Design a protein with these regions (language model features):
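C-terminal region/appendage detector
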Residues: 2-14, 18-21, 29-33, 41-440
């Protein structure tokens, strides 16, 4: 079978030893070849993924064999819809070319009238360019879609304006979060096939795609996004939902807690200024390796100046690292769930001995919130202190905030993956349940 090579960044290992590579897989196997490339500067890992359907095709009852159309895989589109951002671009590229906020604007009721044909949803740059008074709406809650009409508006904007493409000419690969309702996949198929008339589509779990971006076929994916966090054990390409951990705190909760800390110290922000607080988080905050020792440091060593959009300057001090403690002590935001490190160890302890040993050396960090300075080292420290007799190894990629999209880009561009596309004529003939034959 012909294999294509796709470049993925070399992962850094936070622990003391190289992560162990896990063996072959029946339905989806990956060979990780250590190579170097001058392209983009750093060393790259060539990942060759050989795919084949694990389910044999059922013989057609018709006497006439309908030939399956083959989409242009080089022009397949990969879409990763998250609570914070929607990333998209063509398969085969190292990172997404388009990234817009998932939060959209809707006109207030008093500005719209019955029969009014004015625009109902403002997406991306439209939010900046309009003078219409808008309320901000997010169609996702903790990673799960609750407003499909708004998602359709976002994708319409992405396809037609951001990417400037006709979706009916491109196959689309969509990411789906762990533990999501099965109806999600059927809704995606309905929207892509019936609204956008795409010729083919495929849905893949986000955690699996994140793992592919690391060039692995097994691993413990620890993903901390904007609206939800997951700890997902994956063995030979298959997520293990029975021992997957879900945490309902993530980056948006960190932002809200940062606002609380700043308000308590006399720097007052409102909900309408959350985007400013989000920017402060990204530019000024970090994760302390030891928060107790960090508090002993003279405040002047932590204090920095931040200039607000109106030109006013504020001083930021201990809130720069205190806000991130919610990931390791969620009781700070009145959450009864486990800390991220404790949930990670809990998932590992639910695995059998052999699998635990393999996953312990393949802890893969993903998601935008893990980009905070010091995050990987703190998680490594917490895990090492909780299991001193084992050797947990936290692996990180420099662009792990786009790990899901990059994994989808790798997968959708491979020749061996092409039999796993679900085509529109198959959906029309067999219905939405045909998805589960190819998207598993």
């Amino acid at each position: 079978m012909a294999l294509d090579s796709v470049w993925a960044p070399q992962a850094a290992i936070i622990g003391d030893a190289p992560a162990k590579k896990v063996g072959n897989q029946a339905s989806l196997q990956a060979q990780v070849l250590q190579t170097a490339s001058l392209k983009d500067g750093p060393a790259k890992r060539a990942v060759r993924v050989c795919c084949k359907s694990s389910m044999p095709e059922e013989p057609t009852k018709s006497t006439v064999t309908k030939e399956r159309p083959k989409p242009e895989v080089t022009k397949a589109v990969v879409v990763d819809l998250g609570t914070g951002y929607c990333k998209c671009g063509f398969a085969g590229l190292p990172k997404p070319t388009h990234r817009i906020s998932t939060t959209v604007g809707k006109p207030y009721m008093e500005t719209t009238k019955t029969g009014d044909n004015r625009k109902e949803t403002f997406v991306g740059q439209e939010l900046v360019n309009t003078e219409v008074r808008l309320k901000l709406v997010n169609p996702l809650r903790h990673g799960i879609i609750v407003d499909w009409d708004t998602v359709q508006d976002i994708w319409e904007y992405l396809f037609r304006q951001e990417m400037n493409i006709a979706p009916e000419e491109h196959a689309v690969l969509v990411s789906d979060p762990p533990l999501s309702p099965h109806t999600n996949r059927e809704k995606y198929a309905e929207m892509l096939f019936e609204t956008f008339n795409t010729p083919a589509m495929h849905i893949a779990y986000q955690s699996r795609l994140s793992m592919y971006s690391y060039g692995r076929t097994s691993g413990l994916v620890v993903e901390v996004g904007h609206g939800v966090s997951y700890v997902v054990p994956i063995y030979e390409g298959y997520p293990l939902p029975s021992i997957t951990g879900r945490l309902d705190y993530a980056g948006s909760d960190l932002t809200a807690y940062l606002m609380t800390l700043m308000n308590n110290s006399g720097k007052y922000f409102t909900e309408d200024q959350m985007s400013i607080v989000e920017n402060i988080k990204k530019k000024c905050c970090f994760v302390a390796l030891d928060p107790i020792e960090e508090k002993k440091v003279p405040p002047t060593e932590h204090t920095i100046l931040y200039t607000l959009p109106d030109g006013k300057e504020i001083h930021l001090c201990q809130e720069r690292f205190l806000c991130s403690e919610i990931f390791f002590k969620p009781s700070l935001i009145r959450s009864m769930q486990l800390g991220l490190h404790t949930q990670t160890l809990s998932c590992l302890n639910k695995c059998d001995i052999a699998l635990k040993r393999d996953l312990m050396g393949n802890i893969l960090l993903c998601g935008g919130s893990t980009m905070l300075s010091g995050f990987p080292n703190r998680l490594q420290k917490e895990l090492s202190s909780m299991c001193p007799n084992d050797t947990p190894l936290v692996n990180v990629l420099p662009e792990r905030d786009s790990a899901v999209w990059t994994g989808g880009s790798i997968l959708a561009s491979l020749q061996g993956f092409q039999p796993l596309w679900v085509h529109r004529f198959e959906y029309e003939e067999h219905g939405p349940f045909f998805l589960y034959r190819r998207c598993f």
